[in-house]
Amino acid sequence: MNSFRCIYFLLYFSLIGTSVSSGCLLFNENERLSNFCLLESVEGKVVDKNTAMIITQKLKREGYFGGLKKSDWSTSFYPDIDYSGNINGGNPDKPLILGELEFSGDPDFIKQEGIITTLNLRANNRSTFDVGKYLQTNLFGSYSYSPEHNNGFSNASIKSCVSNKIAPKNSVDICASVSQQNKQISESNSKSLSFNLSNLAFNEYIGFSEGKLGLIHFASDVYVQNQLALSWDTIHKENFYSAVRLKVGNPVKQQIALKYGLTLGFSRIISNRKVSLSLTHEVSDGGILLGVDRSDITNKVGFNTLVSPSASVQLGYTSVDSSIDYFDDSYPSLSLTITW
């Protein structure tokens, strides 16, 4: 178990429900917001030695108190069990109907569904330069295997972000990422470059918030798109966390691509356990298949909770409603993740 996870669970059992500052520590989905909440909450107050040590260690990762003495690496290797709706990257097991035309797919290219076991490897690096100025790099790789179909697939990604504090409550983040997925039938690659402006705020009636305005340049195997991103994260006075994400993409000629997407996220401590819920609504359009326009509406719901310091459960459901029935889809997700 890495040092940050140890810190989290020490706080989980010792600080839960005691003050607003406990929310700053427990709701760590947004590191910058969590640290801002901490600094504002403990200013002018006396804290015990252990709490001060934990807070200092956390804030050093963002460049406070002299920052990290050297570049900090952390790694984790963990399995999970999940359900995949398309293990081999195949096509739906139904005919494609376009007007009066009907097409049948090759049975060898039909998608496979079922339980998969996955081995995941993560490596994270943090280097600090000054208060609020740091470089974060995240590496990820995984291999998933289905015993039922004797088949598997791999994922790999790298993301690097430079964060620069330009004012007491404002920062600029520049990020670049590359990802790849290899399946038996299909392969997908994507790249993105983003520029984000962040603003931190405190409202005595609501709590601590971070608003972000971002520009994203996204490129996949088949199209390139520019996107506008807006987000608003809040650690509420009532000790719960909320997040709103809105993303809008420019039209892409003759390619199905994001038109807009909205995600709502919530986290709260219930019965001494952190519980998170997410709701997503996405609309994609612009696609054309044999002269027929295609647009998709995707709705997702996700639920996540910790069942122990080293295990979490994720439940979810995805529904896709397409203007071309062939691409309609719906599937559940259920996974158990164990870390050490």
What does each model-found stretch correspond to?
Residues 1-24:
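Classical Sec-dependent N-terminal signal peptides that target proteins to the secretory pathway
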Residues 23-159:
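Outer-membrane beta-barrel initiation region
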Residues 79-85, 127, 141-147, 176-184, ...:
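Transmembrane beta-strands of outer-membrane beta-barrel pores
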Residues 91-99, 237-243, 247-300, 304-306, ...:
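Outer-membrane beta-barrel transmembrane domain signature
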Residues 113-121, 143, 150-158, 187-193, ...:
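Residues that define the transmembrane beta-barrel architecture of outer-membrane proteins
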Residues 122-126, 159-161, 194-198, 227-233, ...:
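Outer-membrane beta-barrel architecture
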Residues 129-137, 165-176, 200-211, 235-244, ...:
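Repeated loop/turn-to-beta-strand initiation elements of outer-membrane beta-barrel proteins
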Residues 312-316, 327-340:
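Outer-membrane beta-barrel "beta-signal"
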